[in-house]
């Protein structure tokens, strides 16, 4: 995750 608990659901690139 990018380290965000608010947009980690859509930012699972890492």
Curated annotation (Swiss-Prot):
Gene Ontology annotations for the cellular component aspect, listed alphabetically: ribonucleoprotein complex; ribosome
The family this protein is said to belong to: Belongs to the universal ribosomal protein uS19 family.
Reported function: Protein S19 forms a complex with S13 that binds strongly to the 16S ribosomal RNA.
Protein name listed in UniProt: Small ribosomal subunit protein uS19
Domain of life: Bacteria
Disulfide feature: none
Tagged with keyword rRNA-binding: yes
Keyword terms of this UniProt record: Ribonucleoprotein, Ribosomal protein, RNA-binding, rRNA-binding
MF annotations from Gene Ontology: rRNA binding
């Amino acid at each position: 995750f990018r380290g965000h608990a608010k947009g980690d659901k859509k930012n699972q690139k890492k």
